[in-house]
């Protein structure tokens, strides 16, 4: 893979949400603002598609609503969001880029159990829709991974199918979630 191919197929979701922009909508559009692939060719030559055209408010609103974020106003400053809201907005932004692989680095760290569960449900749905997800956590397994690996002191101490050890509630045929726990 070239670096460009890697970036187009793999997304990294950090533990602490980074939401740049004056509004939630601007923060979500950031990858589309930076994406070179958003240019289009017209009779006059290459033309840059505006981020708003590439990702209209309606699509952002629909995505947030489907993620249980109907209470988040697109014009709200991102720095006014709660920790759980910021995590879900960051996750929405990442999912809208439609990566094939998502590396989720402790995205539920610092969240209360309710918000951590919401994030886990969203990730499980993305896996069911065909995305491969690697989720790193310091929490106990939550039953959403199809495979679980555990590291302790730099050594792999557990690896296997989550259904076999009773930590998964179900698996998907198109995508998978690998949960890595660090002790």
Task: Describe these PLM feature segments.
Residues 77-81, 85:
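Conserved ABC ATPase signature
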Residues 102-106:
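Catalytic Walker B motif of ABC-type/P-loop ATPase nucleotide-binding domains
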Residues 113-115:
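Helix N-cap at the start of a conserved alpha-helix in ABC-type nucleotide-binding domains
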